[in-house]
Amino acid sequence: MHMPTPSQSRLLALPVQLLLILAGAAAMARAEELAEQPPITRPGCPDKCGNMSIPFPFGLMPGCFREGFQVTCDHSVDPPRAFLADTDTNRITVTDSDASAASDAAAYPGYTNTSYFPVELVDMSADRSQARAYGPITSGCSTNSTQYRFQTQAMTLGNGITEGPFAVSQTLNVVGGVGWRVDVAVDGSTTLACRTGTKRELAARNGSCAGQGCCEAALPPGPEYGSVAPGLVVADENARWRSSPCSYAMVVEKSRYVFSTPNLYGDRLLLESFPVVLDFAIVGNASCPAKGQRPPPDYACASSNNYCVNATVGLSGYALSYVCKCSEHYEGNPYIANGCRDIDECKFPDLYYSLVEKEASVQPH
């Protein structure tokens, strides 16, 4: 049996040594990368629900969230899903009803069933003081040419007595409708938000929400929406009920619903969910301290290099509240200690090219 010489043994060992060196270098690089990442929550608090980041003021455990920001993580599904925990205050109300005449789905007195569901989160951003959640979609589906089955969905943020920290963003969301002939309104209003047309089928175009098969409009002006319920009015008779039984009304983040003509046929949108943007603020008769004034003990802006902005949020839109922001040239989470970190513009020249160029031009030669 041929035995390798000492020199051959050393050569055979080189690939193994090289792999160990490369693995060690990769581990060190990963450790440095993690060390550079700023914290997003309080020390000792979990910051993930599956792959979803949970930044403070949101949190999963006692001591890890501000009042009103508790999140529950459902590990019974894969991947895990995150929900706002306070279902008495934040919830989706789903009401099923049947009707023989076209009307606003939210106005039907003969409800067959009402169910309540928690608000499911899509993501959260502490630096923008925003979150995204799956929003309400109201549908009306024909069971024959004159009979409809409606499902009305309403999102409620706050219990109507005390102001919650969340509101549906008026500027970052729109109200939309899908169907051959449907009028769309919000919160039972008699003011029409948008209307889809009744022209020939070829007039509908993928990606267009200009009225043929799909319409879209800004949310009506007013205070921040602490609750929102899209409503629809459909035709008295649906001659297309076999091929196009369903019409829809929704409140959705701008550009998140892209119209596709197959949505006019069948009931495929009943299985879809679309995000809405929620603004959040620190509430409880709270406002930013005046210049030179000592902040209150429960002041939420915990990081250095941050500033406070007064806000209005909640069911009435007039509750005293405020949000925290990282100062210019800083980023991160202003709601935790050392959460706002200096931006290294040189690492991101595509984002900060003009600033880097300006700073370079004033350097001494």
Model-identified regions with their sequence ranges:
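Typically disulfide-stabilized, N-glycosylated extracellular/lumenal ectodomains of secreted
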Residues: 2-365
